[in-house]
A protein has these predicted regions:
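An anion/pyrophosphate-binding glycine-rich loop and adjacent beta-alpha core
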Residues: 33-41, 49, 55-56, 91, ...
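Glycine-rich active-site loop/strand segments that organize a redox cofactor
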Residues: 46-94
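A conserved short coil-to-beta-strand element within the FAD-binding core of flavoproteins
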Residues: 124-162
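Glycine-rich loop(s) and the adjacent beta-strand/alpha-helix scaffold that form part
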Residues: 178-224
Length: 429
């Protein structure tokens, strides 16, 4: 079978290698000079290749459409990803949060391994401009879902087209029995993610869920963030509120920046943002999650007793990082010259509330150019979850970030690319 893979990224190269091992003839179209450029920026240049967890545990970390992955992840779980890369000569290690990295800490090693895996495919430097679609004379029909009792006899229309190839941006036509769109999303456009796959999908009448940046830093006009820029907080709890109601909570690390907040906690929280024109978002940071409010009050009382003659700011030396101390005192509203032994119980209670509920207003998402992934994409309702084949066009398939499936940080999104690519290759007939 002639297989055409559009996109030479993580999903594309994985699919190409797997299809080669099924005995197929494979061509990869890649419009960038070098394939898999985005791999080099993942995991801060170290490439968090997957997460060492079970398929069941994995699905709890998938933010959008986890059920779509039941089949592909079951057939190609993280353990198989690790086994594959080790067979390609990559030594792996498991770090905190079961994140899997190459021992070398070099993303280039993962990129080279994928290129070796796809060795034998014809990698062509060209983009994809247009799907070659042939209308089906009598679209095949599929029975309506059994859970729809109102229309038991109604038929759902089958594919209206057959995809027989792609016309490249060069004008050249590439004919194929199976065309896989694995072009990624819109994040990190300098690495080649320019949204071409969305345009191709729409040519076959696919529904597109609006692509938005996800796993991205958050913008806050709160001046306190800029005052603390560069401050990294560890072992804090971040709770994201939408219109006053908590919608996300997690403990970990975060960072204050000149434009707002960033770091792992922030990236995960960003995937829960909806329409920012319709909703108000705030982040609340618990600076001492290991202590209850009463325990923190007692801790503050002890510290202030030991540092009785220090100023209010000086008395915070054991409680907060130095760059946060003056900001805390200002938000606390206490006279900086106040001595620790002059601070009232009521003021200590106010300090407890500030430390347990440090508020950051969220004004915007970071842009797509700096997002780790794109949320949104080709609607999974129109893609077969076992084969990755389009329900709109026979011979057309999708894998990876181009699909409306995304997860938190931790190696989950690359694993989604790998397992959907493997499902495509392993179901070719």
């Amino acid at each position: 079978m002639k297989v055409l893979v559009v996109g030479g990224g993580a999903a594309g190269l994985m699919a190409a290698g797997a299809a080669l091992r099924q005995g197929h003839e494979v061509t990869v179209l890649e419009h960038m000079e070098k394939p898999a450029q985005k791999i080099l920026v993942t995991g801060k240049g170290r490439c968090n290749v997957t997460n060492d967890c079970t398929a069941e545990e994995f699905l709890h970390h998938v933010r959008t459409n986890p059920r779509f992955l039941f089949s592909s992840l079951g057939a190609f779980p993280p353990a198989k990803t690790m086994e594959l890369f080790e067979s390609l000569g990559v030594e792996l290690k498991v770090e905190r949060g079961r994140r899997v990295f190459p021992v070398s800490d070099k993303a280039e090693e993962i990129r080279q391994a994928l290129l070796r895996y796809a060795d034998g495919a014809d990698i062509v430097h060209d983009g994809a401009k247009k799907l070659l679609l042939e209308p089906l004379a009598q679209p095949e029909e599929a029975p309506a879902a059994p859970e729809n009792p109102r229309h038991p006899k109604k038929k759902k229309p089958g594919p209206a087209y057959r995809c027989v190839g792609v016309r490249g941006t060069s004008g050249r036509e590439y004919k194929a029995d199976a065309v896989l769109v694995a072009t990624g999303g819109l994040s990190y456009p300098t690495t080649g993610s320019t949204g071409d796959g969305y345009k191709l999908a729409q040519q076959a009448d696919h529904t597109l869920v609006e692509p938005v940046p996800s796993l991205v830093s958050l913008v806050s006009h709160d001046a306190d963030c800029k005052k603390m820029m560069g401050l990294a907080l560890k072992n804090v709890t971040l709770t994201l509120h939408e219109d006053g109601k908590p919608i996300f909570e997690e403990q970990g690390e975060m960072l204050f920046t000149h434009f707002g907040i960033s770091g792992p906690l922030t990236l995960s929280a960003s995937s829960h943002l909806g329409d920012m024109k319709k909703h108000k978002y705030e982040a609340f940071i618990d600076l001492k999650p290991a202590l209850s409010e009463e325990q923190l009050y007692d801790r503050i009382t002890r510290d202030f007793a030991l540092l009785a003659n220090h100023t209010a700011q000086g008395a915070l030396v054991k409680l907060l990082p130095s760059s946060m101390q003056p900001v805390m005192v200002a938000r606390w509203g206490i006279d900086p010259a106040t001595r620790a032994n002059q601070i009232t119980r009521e003021q200590k209670r106010e300090l407890v509330q500030l430390m347990k509920h440090w508020r950051v207003t969220i004004d915007a998402r970071g842009d797509l150019a700096h997002a780790v992934i794109t949320s949104g994409g080709v609607s999974v309702r129109e893609v077969d979850p076992k084969t990755m084949q389009s329900k709109k066009a026979l011979g057309l398939y999708f894998a990876g970030e181009v699909l409306d499936v995304d997860a938190y940080t931790g190696g989950y999104n690359l694993q989604i690319a790998f397992c959907t690519a493997q499902s495509f290759a392993n179901h070719l007939e």
